[in-house]
Amino acid sequence: MVVSKMNKDAQMRAAINQKLIETGERERLKELLRAKLIECGWKDQLKAHCKEVIKEKGLEHVTVDDLVAEITPKGRALVPDSVKKELLQRIRTFLAQHASL
Amino acid sequence: MKMEEMSLSGLDNSKLEAIAQEIYADLVEDSCLGFCFEVHRAVKCGYFFLDDTDPDSMKDFEIVDQPGLDIFGQVFNQWKSKECVCPNCNRSIAASRFAPHLEKCLGMGRNSSRIANRRIANSNNMNKSESDQEDNDDINDNDWSYGSEKKAKKRKSDKLWYLPFQNPNSPRRSKSLKHKNGELSNSDPFKYNNSTGISYETLGPEELRSLLTTQCGVISEHTKKMCTRSLRCPQHTDEQRRAVRIYFLGPSAALPEVESSLDNDSFDMTDSQALISRLQWDGSSDLSPSDSGSSKTSENQGWGLGTNSSESRKTKKKKSHLSLVGTASSLGSNKKKKPKPPAPPTPSIYDDIN
């Protein structure tokens, strides 16, 4: 019973993701997020942080994995609340539209 | 698929919220990843730190925000007092007036090129001795003078007349000419100041006459010098010019016509005769290159006297007095200058000369 529920859950998520991509909503949301993050200075803050990290490690020894490990938590934390709220709102309306089908 | 979507509607809000959060986290992660790729590429390509500047230089180039200063911290109207030194006449001119001055001084205009050329040619013919030949070459070349392009072309066609007879760059010729001109300048007390005008007290009657046929000549009230501009100089009126001429040359002297004194490139028989005679002279000196200087000069003078009348008639514009003082310079200048057509008007002046 539990396994089937888990399975159903995963299937549902896959279906929603599929829908997001098919309708192009995911692409739109990504673009919106990008624009908002640049607008609010998230990118500049992160870049400053990047510089510190890179100087610390040395220019030659920087790898993408290092950067991702260092940057992603920071990036997630630095997203302003307003941006987060707006994005979540749009995701919810999308879900509501497609859940009612 | 249909079944699952139907089941979506049955999900409670908390489940939907969880999914929404998940999607959001996914998107943020995507953005972060994209940013990381961007930075990594910038680092590996070496342009990541390009926009960095060290704080010292940042301090140096800080934008200044003070009254009376521009953003670089300079007094913004200091250029008003700037002066430039003209490379041609060595006078210092206010920067805002420099371009118009240079145009006049270098002779880049239509009219001013004539004036400037005449001025330089005059001063060279009368003042210089050794470098006479080279300078004349430069002046008459006119390659650099935009306004006189047409003139230069005409001159080229003139040169066709000369070329078979003589080589203007022949060292022997220039040598003998230099010699002659050196003698001439010693005997010529004429002083010509290019920049300020002419003090007429120092001029002899012949020089005065030739000056007045080529230049405005009106005497300034302030400097007591004669105006060295063209006959049409806008600063003085025809009345003033006439008055000066009457004062110097007597009541018979009228204002010479400007048109006739300008170049007009016609060629008459006396010119070609003069050329032929010069050719003969050239040939003779070719035959005896070891001639002493004195014999050459006598030869030259003899030739000059023989063609004196035609010379002075052709070049009376500015060299008639020279042909009277010393014949050699008229020879030299005539060689470089275009032959001037006989100027029929203003007979009173020219009758005096001839």
Swiss-Prot record, chain A:
Its main location: nucleus. Keywords: Acetylation, Activator, Chromatin regulator, Isopeptide bond, mRNA transport, Nucleus, Protein transport, Transcription, Transcription regulation, Translocation, Transport, Ubl conjugation. One of its GO terms (cellular component) is transcription export complex 2. GO terms for molecular function: chromatin binding; transcription coactivator activity. There is a cross-link at residue 74 (Glycyl lysine isopeptide (Lys-Gly) (interchain with G-Cter in SUMO2)). InterPro entries: TF_ENY2, TF_EnY2_sf. One of its GO terms (biological process) is negative regulation of insulin secretion involved in cellular response to glucose stimulus. The keyword Nucleus applies. It comes from the Eukaryota. It is found in: Nucleus, Nucleoplasm. Component of the nuclear pore complex (NPC)-associated TREX-2 complex (transcription and export complex 2), composed of at least ENY2, the isoform GANP of the MCM3AP gene, PCID2, SEM1, and either centrin CETN2 or CETN3. TREX-2 contains 2 ENY2 chains. The TREX-2 complex also associates with ALYREF/ALY and with the nucleoporin NUP153. Component of some SAGA transcription coactivator-HAT complexes, at least composed of ATXN7, ATXN7L3, ENY2, GCN5L2, SUPT3H/SPT3, TAF10, TRRAP and USP22. Involved in mRNA export coupled transcription activation by association with both the TREX-2 and the SAGA complexes. The transcription regulatory histone acetylation (HAT) complex SAGA is a multiprotein complex that activates transcription by remodeling chromatin and mediating histone acetylation and deubiquitination. Within the SAGA complex, participates in a subcomplex that specifically deubiquitinates both histones H2A and H2B. The SAGA complex is recruited to specific gene promoters by activators such as MYC, where it is required for transcription. HAMAP family: ENY2_Sus1. Belongs to the ENY2 family. PANTHER family: ENHANCER OF YELLOW 2 TRANSCRIPTION FACTOR. This is Transcription and mRNA export factor ENY2. It comes from Homo sapiens. The lineage of its organism: Eukaryota, Metazoa, Chordata, Craniata, Vertebrata. The gene is ENY2.
